[in-house]
Every structure is written in structure tokens, then in C-alpha cells.
């Protein structure tokens, strides 16, 4: 599965899932632009990855970043909307308030989940898809989660993820005539930096590396018939079974279901 001559953009990719996605795309030959507010530590030998500083809550910042990318690369073939601000400030004055009932939640938390979430995905897609339309092909992957379908601790969280899946469905409808595929992709329990800090409290027996999500994106981007998936919600572990890849440690995580989350 080679992606030579393809240009990919992964938003919010200086760490966690986004960084794993960027690594896998680059490893399979794509030229990868990763955006984020913090400067990532460089990966050894990762000459195909270009960091573009961008605060996705700032429209001018986003427009400048995509302007730079399109100036340098002249095209965007793959867009992975991964940026997410919903986990910031989960503690207030040392107290975990993220899972409080909605009537006790500050409105800034709702705003954070949408501004650095579905709104950021919408804006990035607006800027990226004209390049795809011009070539009548492209892939947009919106990273989402089961909270779109089931309450998982925070009302605003669920609404923002449901909005992401609706964004996927409606963008897919408008972009299908142009040969562009849009999907939502659900990871499982991912061994991100933050998760590993709490590893002693978690059951990681069915967890996934950040690169596993990247392998799912690579598989979709490599499939000439990928448009059969457009508008769908896909689970990374199900994608692994369909396309026959495993995680970086050789394991194949079991796909989660609503009953598991």
C-alpha cells in the first residue's frame, strides 16, 4: 500500500492519534503536513513530514496554514480531521469536572468541543476539498467516537461527536459526484501519551497504538474502490479486518461495539 505522490494533511497531529496517523502516512510514501499549536519532537528519518503551526480555533491561522500547504504542495489528496480541544482543562482547581452533569458544566467547555472539533473539521474541509474537486478524487477522514451514539460522561462531548458524524454524512452527499470519499473513523482505546500516563489504572489488553489508526487511514487511501464507504462510520479495528493489517506489535485489536463503551 504505497501513497507516493500523494499529499496528506493531518490536523492536530503533534501528538497522540494524529501523530500516529501522520507517521503511517509518511511511512507509506505520502508527503504529510501536520498541524498543531505545539512543536513536535522530530521523528528520526521522518523527512516526509512537514510541521505547520496552526491554532484551529483561529480562522486566520487556519487560512494561512492551508494557504502555505497549497502553495508548497499544490494539492491535497488526503485530509484527516483529527484536531480536538474537548479534553483540555478537564480539571478545575484540582477537581475533575469534565463528567459533571450538563447543568453544572461551564459553557466554555461546550465551545471548546465545537471550536476545536466539528467547526475546525468543517473549516479545514472547506479549504482542502477544492483541490480534490479539481482532480475528481480525494479522501476526508473525520476522527470521531462512540459518544456520537451513546452517552459517555459528558453531554457536550456526545453532541459534538454526533455533529461530526452528521458532517461526514452531509459532506459525503455533496462530494460524491466529485469522486471524493468522506468517512468518520472511530478508534478504540488508544495508547496515547495521556493514556499511558494512567496505564496502571486501565485495562490495555484490547488497546491500539496511534499508528493503528494511521494504518486504517492508509488502507482506505490505498483502496481504489474506497468510495463504497463514503458517508459511513467506520471502526478502525473493523477496517483492519477488512483490509488485513495488524497493529505495530502484531496484534489485531477486537472491534468495539456500543455494548463495550
Regions found by a protein language model. Name each.
Residues 46-60:
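Rossmann-fold cofactor-recognition segment
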Residues 184, 202-261:
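C-terminal helical subdomain
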Amino acid at each position: 500500500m504505497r501513497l507516493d505522490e500523494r499529499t496528506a494533511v493531518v490536523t492536530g497531529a503533534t501528538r497522540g492519534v494524529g501523530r500516529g496517523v501522520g507517521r503511517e502516512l509518511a511511512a507509506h510514501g505520502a508527503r504529510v503536513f501536520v498541524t498543531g499549536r505545539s512543536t513536535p519532537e522530530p521523528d528520526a528519518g521522518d523527512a516526509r513530514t512537514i510541521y505547520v503551526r496552526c491554532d484551529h480555533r483561529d480562522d486566520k491561522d487556519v487560512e494561512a496554514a492551508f494557504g502555505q500547504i497549497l502553495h508548497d504542495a499544490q494539492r491535497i489528496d488526503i485530509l484527516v480531521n483529527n484536531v480536538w480541544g474537548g479534553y483540555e482543562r478537564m480539571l478545575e482547581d484540582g477537581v475533575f469536572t469534565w463528567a459533571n452533569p450538563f447543568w453544572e458544566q461551564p459553557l466554555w467547555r461546550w465551545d471548546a468541543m465545537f471550536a476545536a472539533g466539528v467547526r475546525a473539521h468543517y473549516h479545514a474541509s472547506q479549504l482542502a476539498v477544492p483541490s480534490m474537486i479539481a482532480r475528481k478524487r480525494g479522501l476526508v477522514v473525520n476522527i470521531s467516537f462512540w459518544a456520537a451514539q451513546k452517552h459517555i460522561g459528558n453531554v457536550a462531548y456526545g453532541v459534538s461527536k454526533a455533529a461530526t458524524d452528521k458532517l461526514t454524512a452531509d459532506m459525503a452527499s455533496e462530494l460524491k459526484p466529485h469522486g471524493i470519499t468522506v468517512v468518520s473513523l472511530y478508534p478504540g482505546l488508544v495508547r496515547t501519551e495521556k493514556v499511558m500516563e494512567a496505564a496502571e489504572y486501565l485495562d490495555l489488553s484490547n488497546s491500539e497504538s496511534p499508528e493503528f489508526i494511521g494504518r486504517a487511514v492508509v488502507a482506505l487511501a490505498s483502496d481504489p474502490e474506497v468510495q463504497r464507504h463514503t458517508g459511513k462510520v467506520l471502526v478502525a479495528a473493523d477496517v483492519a479486518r477488512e483490509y488485513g493489517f495488524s497493529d505495530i506489535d502484531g496484534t489485531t485489536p477486537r472491534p468495539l461495539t456500543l455494548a463495550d463503551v
